């Protein structure tokens, strides 16, 4: 193999099998794809050791992709249940799965996930450090942080979230600028705690080249995490968030010099009127690197419905240029999601991604909508169900209420506008009061 990473191949003009797959899936010219990858504006996360992957591209001009979070925890350590969620995510065509396991047999779960997942896989190695070494956070060494990252890379994960932008300067900015909800990133808060307890610099920032060595070796895509993402709409677009983003932009250029692919992670909680500016800032400060957003969640008052608050923000963010949406489930802020929560979160996020692709003018995005509209005009219910983003729910709702006329529904019955327009345009009479 005459290249180290997908980005290295793109710079050298080498077409990889992963590029061919993405080119065919997206309908994008392969030369255009290669050029955008060489510039860092598109990534194809594909670890050399993830043999079951069906490669996906993330970035400029491509369909908006979605990620599903899952994984075992101390309170919910059932590996088989999490694997059911994996199957659900793959069956529903989620392009990415993040294993956020933080307790118990994390290696066993990760190994099985890599074996079965055709979706790209991400992890947050920081979550795994304490359990892996069975040591208190304060006692973890710099070498141990990097050993866990390499362990995840060797196991075959395609991208890792690393909060390398949380350096001492960012922390000083945090201290000078009071926040309502402080640091809400789990990995970011753990790293902050380690830095404070040991009076040390962030090891992933201080020894960033060591991190790049691992990424280059395994073609591991680096998802630069936003430790200081806003955890409330009150904290959005504040000094510490922007300070960290500037640092991530600087680290992005260093990664690209080593041909390491980069994704930038983003907010978080944010009012709707700030979303466009945040996408613009990321694209400017991080040089066009793909933007991966958690939501954004546009209001803080809807626990139990945060799949809706995040779908609103995600649709807006992606329409303005964000490339990758992390799903949020109805269980967000409340508990670990169950299988039904996962399904609802995927559906909501897929709707947001698709709506954004229409707005962005992604080639072919409107085709399925036009097919659905044509099926509605013809009152072809079977075709409507086959095109629906959640066919199972559509069929169930239809069966729960039987109309008088099978071609209409119980909302309008004989007053169905489509049914009556079809009849009138065909030169037929309509009977609203009489039997047909």
UniProtKB/Swiss-Prot annotation:
Reactions catalysed, as given in the entry: 5-amino-1-(5-phospho-beta-D-ribosyl)imidazole + S-adenosyl-L-methionine = 4-amino-2-methyl-5-(phosphooxymethyl)pyrimidine + CO + 5'-deoxyadenosine + formate + L-methionine + 3 H(+)
One example GO MF annotation: carbon-carbon lyase activity
Pathway: Cofactor biosynthesis; thiamine diphosphate biosynthesis
Any one GO CC term of the record: cytosol
Binding residues for [4Fe-4S] cluster: 409, 412, 416
Residue positions binding Zn(2+): 269, 333
Coiled coil: none
Binding residues for substrate: 69, 98, 127, 163, 185-187, 226-229, 265, 292
EC identifiers of the protein: 4.1.99.17
Keywords assigned by UniProt, alphabetized: 4Fe-4S, Iron, Iron-sulfur, Lyase, Metal-binding, S-adenosyl-L-methionine, Thiamine biosynthesis, Zinc
InterPro entries: ThiC, ThiC/Bza_core_dom, ThiC/BzaA/B
GO BP annotations, alphabetical order: thiamine biosynthetic process; thiamine diphosphate biosynthetic process
Cofactor note: Binds 1 [4Fe-4S] cluster per subunit. The cluster is coordinated with 3 cysteines and an exchangeable S-adenosyl-L-methionine.
Named cofactor requirement(s): [4Fe-4S] cluster
Known role: Catalyzes the synthesis of the hydroxymethylpyrimidine phosphate (HMP-P) moiety of thiamine from aminoimidazole ribotide (AIR) in a radical S-adenosyl-L-methionine (SAM)-dependent reaction.
Record family assignment: Belongs to the ThiC family.
Identification of the protein by name: Phosphomethylpyrimidine synthase
Name of the encoding gene: thiC
């Amino acid at each position: 193999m005459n290249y180290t990473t997908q980005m290295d191949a793109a710079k050298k003009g080498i077409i990889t099998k992963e590029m061919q797959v993405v080119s065919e899936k997206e309908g994008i010219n392969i030369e255009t794809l290669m050029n955008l990858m060489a510039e860092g504006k598109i990534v194809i996360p594909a670890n050399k050791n993830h043999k079951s992957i069906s490669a996906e591209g993330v970035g400029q001009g491509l369909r908006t992709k979605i990620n599903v979070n899952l994984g075992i925890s101390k309170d919910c350590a059932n590996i088989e249940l999490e694997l059911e969620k994996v199957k659900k995510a793959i069956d529903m065509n989620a392009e990415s799965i993040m294993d956020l396991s933080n307790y118990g047999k994390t290696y066993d779960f990760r190994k099985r996930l890599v074996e079965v997942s055709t979706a790209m896989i991400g992890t947050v190695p920081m979550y795994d450090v304490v359990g892996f070494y069975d040591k208190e956070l304060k006692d973890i060494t710099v070498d141990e942080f990097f050993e866990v990252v390499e362990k995840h890379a060797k196991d075959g994960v395609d991208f890792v979230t690393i909060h390398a932008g949380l350096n001492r300067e960012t922390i000083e900015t945090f201290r000078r600028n009071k926040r309502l909800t402080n640091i809400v990133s789990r990995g970011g808060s753990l790293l902050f705690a380690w830095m404070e307890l040991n009076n040390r610099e962030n090891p992933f920032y201080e020894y960033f080249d060591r991190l790049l060595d691992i990424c280059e070796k395994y073609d591991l895509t680096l998802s630069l995490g936003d430790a200081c993402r806003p955890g409330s709409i009150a904290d959005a677009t504040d000094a510490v968030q922007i300070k960290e983003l500037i640092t991530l932009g600087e680290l992005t250029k260093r990664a690209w010099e080593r041909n390491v692919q980069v994704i930038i992670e983003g907010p978080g909680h944010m009012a709707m009127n700030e979303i466009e500016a945040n996408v613009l800032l990321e694209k400017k400060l991080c040089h066009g690197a793909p933007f991966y957003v958690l939501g954004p969640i546009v209001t803080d008052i809807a626990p139990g419905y945060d799949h809706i608050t995040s779908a609103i923000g995600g649709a807006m963010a992606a329409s303005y240029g964000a490339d990758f949406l992390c799903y949020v489930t109805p269980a967000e802020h409340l508990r670990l999601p169950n299988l039904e929560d996962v399904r609802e979160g995927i559906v909501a996020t897929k709707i947001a991604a698709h709506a954004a692709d229409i707005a962005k003018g992604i080639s072919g995005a409107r085709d399925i909508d036009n097919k659905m509209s044509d099926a509605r005009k013809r009152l072809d219910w079977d075709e409507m169900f086959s095109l629906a983003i959640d066919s199972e729910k559509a069929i169930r709702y239809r069966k729960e209420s039987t109309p008088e006329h099978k071609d209409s529904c119980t909302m309008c019955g004989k007053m169905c506008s489509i049914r009556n327009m079809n009849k009138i345009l065909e030169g037929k009479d309509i009977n609203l009061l009489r039997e047909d």
